[in-house]
Amino acid sequence: MHVLAARLGEILHSPVQLGEPLSRHTSWRIGGPAEIFLSPCDTKELVASLELLAQVGMPWIALGAGTNVLVRDGGFRGAVIHTGGLQDMAFDADGRARVGGGVPVMRLIRHCVERGLAGLEDLAGLPATIGGAVVMNAGAGKQDLAGVLDGAFLAGPSGVEYWPADRLELGYRTSAVPPGRIVTAASLRFRKASPEVLETYVRQRVQQRRKAQGVGKPNAGSVFKNPPGQQAWRLIDSCELRGFAVGGAQVSEKHANFIVNRGGARAEDVLRLIAEIQKKVEKRTGIVLEPEVKVVGQA
């Protein structure tokens, strides 16, 4: 492992870390160690790293903002590639933009507000990066990535390929981004709007999100997808589960579709709590809730 880390270190400008606790990099503050943790500063470093990892047969996962993911307590036996270095962002005069996969969604929205570009303002306050937002077709209110996405640049061991939006097949919290590919950038299109109107709206959206979801404890956002014609939080509420806990994991008192780390929670606590919620909701309503959170790593 030290030899591989040294070889990766020759590629990267940032340090390669061994045994890095992933709890430091996830919004739940949960997760065991990564065998190797690396942070490419650009697409060239990323592709070179993927090529080397493929040569040695090392499994890997990408990690952006660390939201919408649960890392198991045993950590990840392989490489974790942090995409925070992919920060390029460029706009043209026609309201189109190319945005790096590591750019936080909120940072993009702020730039759009300054330029009077509308299309993602409903996502204000969403704790995600553009790369992760493309992979899961992140959405809020009446908007999602699919509404502004022209295409995405996907990196693999052999280089970067552009996929147009129709090939990405964005649906409700899903896309066709395949395993073994990382979103390095997204090509987006926006419509013109008043910067002043956008600024007011975005401020209101952030305030609304904080009021409705400001749980004050580590969490990963919404845990379950909304079933067709239903809202997951209402189904959970119908079972009177706010405050229900397993170990250090607890259904938020503020928002029923959030699970919070109330202190010392382990991934196993969260998984057991998810299973309990599913069982109780199915028993009461007949509906099986589908998790929105991706689970990675070993128990």
UniProtKB/Swiss-Prot annotation:
EC code: 1.3.1.98
CC annotations in GO: cytosol
Chief subcellular location: cytoplasm
Gene3D superfamilies for this protein: 3.30.465.10, UDP-N-acetylenolpyruvoylglucosamine reductase, C-terminal domain, Uridine Diphospho-n-acetylenolpyruvylglucosamine Reductase, domain 2
Classification via InterPro entries: FAD-bd_PCMH, FAD-bd_PCMH-like_sf, FAD-bd_PCMH_sub1, FAD-bd_PCMH_sub2, MurB, MurB_C, MurB_C_sf, Oxid_FAD_bind_N
Biological process, per Gene Ontology: cell division; cell wall organization; peptidoglycan biosynthetic process; regulation of cell shape
Catalytic activity entry: UDP-N-acetyl-alpha-D-muramate + NADP(+) = UDP-N-acetyl-3-O-(1-carboxyvinyl)-alpha-D-glucosamine + NADPH + H(+)
Domain FAD-binding PCMH-type residues, every copy: 29-193
UniProt GO MF annotations: FAD binding; UDP-N-acetylmuramate dehydrogenase activity
Cellular localization per UniProt: Cytoplasm
Name the record gives this protein: UDP-N-acetylenolpyruvoylglucosamine reductase
Organism: Syntrophotalea carbinolica (strain DSM 2380 / NBRC 103641 / GraBd1)
Encoding gene, per UniProt annotation: murB
